[in-house]
């Protein structure tokens, strides 16, 4: 028997899945309408066995008429089945963001952009909600196009964030008719469902209007100056073999921007929320940093092993408020069976990240932000994801199986470097009202985040100030980063 999910359901699905898992168990079927069948996994054990160890059979995607077809015309890797087209894009992404390249080529850029983030916060502390998006976007933009994002007001950065929000909203169940399960709904007047086709068409045009001019800039630079060590240059250098259409190239580059900008920015904002709400965690991390580094020394990637508590904080942020709490469904390519449970070909499998991360048997007092729960798991998330051991897995913030985030190595480094430098350079506290009373920051998962596929922070306010003597050091380091590294990018 399958639980019936109403065709109009939309709100807080990951939370509802978690409640149902407590009632029906860690693996339960979910029927959407009269045809669509899902299986929801709220168990690290089952996720590891069905998505990691059987990834050859569980890496397809369900139909996605609205986003996959109308918005991206079948060219977006996120909505592709695990076919040859998807494998090519996956291969190209891993070639850009594999661990070796992150350690040897990309780390200087990440360090420099993180230093620029500190500078931004010194100069414009009240814009703290915008600076993380600039940081993450500039890293991805530089790697893909060789073009930086110097300020959060850069037009491409603003428009990308708006597009990602609209994608998240439009992709949520209930935002458009369930045409993937009831195809006849495609032919009903769209005004009956919020002009969903028009919204999708407009969003598609906005996507192309954002990405295509960036590709044009690279083509112009190659013609006038020459090639550069970017993702797009590498693709164009092999275009005779790859034979990609111009639209495929635009969407493929755009996918990297969409996937890397908002999730990383939201994670850093969640870090701010946690540090304000749990000041003892912030104080402990700062004490460790101060005890390890000499005066005038700012944390860097080379300090990862010396700052285990910061590594724990990164993991706990991703566990406490995962940027994608429900994950995008996988689909089975063939019938499967596991421990007496039968799964039919075409069944969608949802990894309920929120539910796993709030499993009290796995994470005691899961609602509490407690980095020390990872005291025995301070290695990088990719190590535990590749181990295939559910008990040793730290978290599922990057997904599972062959659909795990291809930018996991870059994200792990960018998040650690940013959080370590922020803890070294600043103290974040609650704002005070006109009477001098602290203003609490809302961290309630039901009210502090925008409802949608992605867990985006709603506006909040904090007081962020440089620690004693750090502002001058930050400005000197930022000038050096600009001269030595960032000036090489447009």
UniProtKB/Swiss-Prot annotation:
The keyword Metal-binding applies. It comes from the Eukaryota. Its cofactor is heme. Keywords: Heme, Iron, Metal-binding, Monooxygenase, Oxidoreductase. Heme binds at residue 405. It is an enzyme of class 1 (oxidoreductase). It catalyses: 2-hydroxymethyl-3-pentylphenol + reduced [NADPH--hemoprotein reductase] + O2 = (8S)-annullatin E + oxidized [NADPH--hemoprotein reductase] + H2O + H(+). GO terms for molecular function: heme binding; iron ion binding; monooxygenase activity; oxidoreductase activity, acting on paired donors, with incorporation or reduction of molecular oxygen. Disulfide bonds: none annotated. InterPro entries: Cyt_P450, Cyt_P450_E_grp-I, Cyt_P450_sf, Cytochrome_P450_fung. Its EC number is 1.-.-.-. The keyword Flavoprotein does not apply. Cytochrome P450 monooxygenase; part of the gene cluster that mediates the biosynthesis of annullatin D, an alkylated aromatic polyketide with a fused dihydrobenzofuran lactone ring system that exhibits potent agonistic activities toward the cannabinoid receptors. Within the pathway, anuE catalyzes the hydroxylation of 2-hydroxymethyl-3-pentylphenol at the side chain to produce (8S)-annullatin E. This is Cytochrome P450 monooxygenase anuE.
């Amino acid at each position: 028997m399958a639980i019936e999910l109403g065709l109009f359901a939309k709100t807080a699905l990951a939370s509802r899945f978690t409640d149902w898992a407590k009632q029906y168990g860690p693996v339960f079927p979910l029927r959407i309408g009269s045809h669509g069948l899902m299986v929801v996994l709220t168990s690290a054990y089952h996720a590891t066995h069905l998505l990691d160890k059987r990834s050859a059979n569980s890496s397809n995607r369900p139909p996605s008429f609205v986003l996959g077809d109308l918005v991206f015309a079948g060219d977006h890797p996120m909505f592709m089945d695990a076919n040859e087209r998807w494998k090519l894009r996956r291969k190209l992404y891993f070639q850009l963001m594999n661990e070796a390249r992150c350690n040897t080529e990309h780390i200087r850029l990440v360090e420099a952009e993180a230093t620029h983030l500190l500078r931004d916060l010194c100069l414009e502390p009240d814009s703290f909600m915008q600076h993380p998006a600039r940081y993450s976007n500039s890293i991805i933009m530089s790697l893909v196009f060789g073009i930086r994002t110097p300020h959060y007001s850069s037009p491409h950065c603003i428009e990308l964030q708006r597009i990602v929000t609209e994608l998240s909203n439009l992709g949520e169940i209930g935002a458009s008719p369930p045409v993937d399960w009831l195809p006849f709904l495609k032919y009903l007047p769209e005004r009956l469902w919020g002009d969903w086709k028009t919204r999708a068409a407009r969003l598609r045009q906005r996507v192309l209007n954002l990405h295509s001019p960036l590709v044009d800039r690279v083509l112009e630079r190659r013609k006038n100056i020459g090639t550069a060590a970017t993702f797009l240059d590498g693709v164009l250098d092999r275009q005779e073999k790859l034979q990609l259409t111009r639209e495929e190239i635009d969407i493929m580059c755009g996918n990297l921007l969409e996937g890397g900008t908002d999730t990383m920015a939201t994670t850093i904002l969640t870090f701010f929320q946690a540090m304000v709400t749990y000041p003892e965690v912030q104080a402990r991390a700062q004490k460790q940093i101060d005890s390890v580094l000499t005066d005038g020394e700012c944390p860097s990637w080379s300090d990862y092993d010396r700052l285990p508590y910061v590594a724990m904080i990164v993991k706990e942020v991703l566990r406490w408020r995962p940027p994608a709490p429900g994950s995008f469904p996988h689909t089975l390519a063939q019938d499967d069976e596991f421990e007496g449970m039968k799964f039919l070909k075409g069944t969608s499998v949802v990894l309920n990240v929120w539910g796993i991360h709030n499993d009290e048997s796995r994470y005691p007092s899961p609602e509490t932000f407690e980095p020390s729960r990872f005291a025995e798991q301070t290695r990088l998330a990719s190590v535990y994801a590749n181990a295939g051991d559910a008990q040793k897995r730290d978290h599922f913030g990057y997904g599972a199986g062959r659909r795990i985030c291809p930018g996991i190595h870059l994200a792990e480094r960018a998040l650690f470097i940013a959080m370590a430098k922020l803890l070294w350079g600043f103290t974040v506290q609650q704002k005070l009202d006109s009477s001098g009373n602290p203003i609490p920051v809302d961290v309630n998962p039901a009210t502090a985040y925008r409802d949608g596929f992605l867990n985006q922070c709603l506006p909040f306010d904090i007081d962020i100030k440089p620690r004693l003597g750090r502002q001058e050091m930050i400005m000197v380091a930022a000038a050096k980063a600009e001269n030595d590294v960032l000036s090489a990018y447009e």
